[in-house]
């Protein structure tokens, strides 16, 4: 295990103790809100540092006792048992702190824009895109998040050719960001008379929702066009007679929104445009960092096949971490935590390896 950054631990603890003092001094309401937010961010790591230091002091006391040759044999045996237990506890605490002290992704606490597009497979791909959207809807509901459809183009046989939604709630992006990529399904379509298994795919993109302060969009860099809305006529389309299309001229990114009012159209389209530009900048910065240290960690390449859903076998396989679960029905019902937790653990282990390589 890599050496803990003791100097950084000191800085975190000093900052946390300063915040505790400032909050107790009765600051203004605005200042208190900011302090409380930072307090919440640092509380777990600060408490872990304090607990580790207490356990390390206990271990040092036991070592001092065991170094005394004159102590009674029975007391020595008890002290040795205590030392093993405390040493194990210290190692566990150190591993936990290694993870807590990893560099934070500034986007982790942001809301997200979820985009799902049917890929190869025609009607079956659109149906699968619909299944994926419902899976994420159920997962969001379990976590108390809110899902709001921004735009949708329905498939001719059901499902979606494309659906875009905003997902809001605590820690949304931190949980969903590893879902970006190509999702593949293997199953027998309802229209397949011979019972043959078909393979189709859908692409998922999860973008952190950007604020105005995250992305500076100059008025002269965008073109706004109003046009008639079009779609398959489902519940999420044709809610207004016209739609707004915003084109970001420097990048060529185009966003279309068909909300119930022109004001909502423009606001929604700008929300998605900001998210896409923010994601583009994050990807560029991540690629530069990866190139610099020659190690890629969780790039979320959307051309990468990340997961296969095999219905005949009731199997879900995440190819990035070689995880296979035989609980497809439950996963499709939104029970994604086991998969997402494994992906986060894998990501953290890669970050730890990168930190060790750089230290």
From Swiss-Prot:
Post-translational modification: Methylated by PrmC. Methylation increases the termination efficiency of RF1.
InterPro entries, per the entry: PCRF, Pep_chain_release_fac_I, Pep_chain_release_fac_I_sf, Prokaryotic/Mito_RF, RF-1
GO cellular component, one term: cytoplasm
Keywords: Cytoplasm, Methylation, Protein biosynthesis
Single GO MF descriptor: translation release factor activity, codon specific
Subcellular location: Cytoplasm
N5-methylglutamine modified-residue sites: 235
Xref: NCBIfam families: prfA (TIGR00019), PRK00591.1 (NF001859)
Protein family according to the UniProt entry: Belongs to the prokaryotic/mitochondrial release factor family.
Purpose of the protein: Peptide chain release factor 1 directs the termination of translation in response to the peptide chain termination codons UAG and UAA.
Protein name: Peptide chain release factor 1
Originating organism: Chelativorans sp. (strain BNC1)
Origin organism lineage: Bacteria, Pseudomonadati, Pseudomonadota, Alphaproteobacteria, Hyphomicrobiales
Protein encoded by which gene: prfA
């Amino acid at each position: 295990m890599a050496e803990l950054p003791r100097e950084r631990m000191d800085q975190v603890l000093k900052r946390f103790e300063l915040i505790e003092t400032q909050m107790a001094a009765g600051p203004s309401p605005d200042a208190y809100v900011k302090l409380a937010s930072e307090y919440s961010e640092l509380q777990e790591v600060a408490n872990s540092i304090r607990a580790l230091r207490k356990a390390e002091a206990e271990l040092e006391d036991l070592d001092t006792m065991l170094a005394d040759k004159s102590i009674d044999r029975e007391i020595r045996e008890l002290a040795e048992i205590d030392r093993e237990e405390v040493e194990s506890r210290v190692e566990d605490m150190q591993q936990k702190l290694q993870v807590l002290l990893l560099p934070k992704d500034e986007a982790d606490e942001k809301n997200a824009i979820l985009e799902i597009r049917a890929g190869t497979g025609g009607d079956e791909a659109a149906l699968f895109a619909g299944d994926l959207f419902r899976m994420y809807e159920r997962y969001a509901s379990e976590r108390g998040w809110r899902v709001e459809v921004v735009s949708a183009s329905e498939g001719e046989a059901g499902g979606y050719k494309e659906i875009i939604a905003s997902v809001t709630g605590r820690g949304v992006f931190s949980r969903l960001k590893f879902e970006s990529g190509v999702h593949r399904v293997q199953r027998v379509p309802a229209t397949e008379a011979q019972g043959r298994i078909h393979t189709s795919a859908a692409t998922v993109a999860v973008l952190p929702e950007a604020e105005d302060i995250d992305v500076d969009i100059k008025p002269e860099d965008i073109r706004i066009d109003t046009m008639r809305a079009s779609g398959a006529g489902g519940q999420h389309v044709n809610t207004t007679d016209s739609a707004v299309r915003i084109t970001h001229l420097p990048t060529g990114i185009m966003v279309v929104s068909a909300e119930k009012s022109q004001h909502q159209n423009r606001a929604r389209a700008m929300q998605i445009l900001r998210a896409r530009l923010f994601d583009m900048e994050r990807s560029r910065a991540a690629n530069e960092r990866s190139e610099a240290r020659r190690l890629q960690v969780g790039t979320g390449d959307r051309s990468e096949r990340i997961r296969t859903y095999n219905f005949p076998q009731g199997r879900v396989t995440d190819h990035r971490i070689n995880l296979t679960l035989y609980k497809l029905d439950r996963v499709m019902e939104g029970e994604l935590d086991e998969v997402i937790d494994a992906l986060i653990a894998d990501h953290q282990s890669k970050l730890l390896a990168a930190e060790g390589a750089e230290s």
